[in-house]
Amino acid sequence: MDFFATFFNHVMTSMPVVTKVAYVSMHIKKYLKELERDDKFRDKLVRVLKLFIDKKITLDNMCAILDARTASG
């Protein structure tokens, strides 16, 4: 999941805040649209994203969760 961490670190350092929000929002919406058939995973992903946005989990925690999902499924 190094790619995920590197991507977000690059986004955080290279773009103005408004651009970051728009870019990430666009990709999250696109990804969620693709997940319409997998409601259970989509709901879990939304919960994890909300925790990350509320700063209740770190980027490392988020990567670990996604790694676990990839390994299991």
UniProtKB/Swiss-Prot annotation:
Pfam families xrefs: AcMNPV_Ac75 (PF06648)
Domain of life: Viruses
Protein name as catalogued: Uncharacterized 8.5 kDa protein in POL 3'region
Species this protein is from: Lymantria dispar multicapsid nuclear polyhedrosis virus
